[in-house]
Amino acid sequence: MARATGLSQTAVARIWRAFALQPHRTETFKLSKDPLFIEKVRDIVGLYVQPPDRALVLCVDEKSQIQALDRSAPVLPLRPGQPERHAHDYIRHGTTTLFAALDVRTGRVIGECHPRHRAQEFRRFLDTIDAAVPRHLDVHLILDNYATHKTAAIRRWLAKRPRYHVHFTPTSSSWLNLVERWFVELTEKQIRRGVHRSTRELIDAIRHYLAVTNETATPFVWTKTADEILASVARFCERTSNSGH
């Protein structure tokens, strides 16, 4: 830039700082094209900020293809001035899929692992949820638009259980499902830091994490209203449309 403009590197850097420009950085974005985007945002955020009485709100999803990875060298432990260190190379030992349902009110999670993530496994997880939640409560399920959540078998399962109410997130809007935030914590605190020499070791580690965190669970707090979210999306769309692209 300095060579192209005839300015010094110091001058270019000063201009970039003055206008908060960071040309070395890039980010990706994806906007939902769901025609019911506004209605779905209001519906789901309403469940977060004002959960219905005598009902459970469960954020449900699956974290698929979790790899059981063994490091090629022992993990070097944390030391003063030095973080825990892992070898870059690893050995794969298969994968598992975690199905999880986050209770919005308590922060506790119902979870189980399966080798695959088809509709059959999802229906079995719904059976697990049904056995775990009190019979006198209605259950509101927040789900994404993954095809396994909408098969005929799943629709029949739901039709036979009128206490269940399904709320689908808008397309391309996984950020609206709070269980995704829990998946981030699981990944950072357990999966990435662990050494798993088999899928059984990985599954045992996930189950242990579930048991320990459920003992001291606290709910995630949703802070933005639907109006604030929609206004933010509208501003972003306006900036994007005026960017000249």
Predicted regions and their residues:
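Extended, low-complexity cationic-aromatic segments
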Residues: 3, 39-127, 232-239
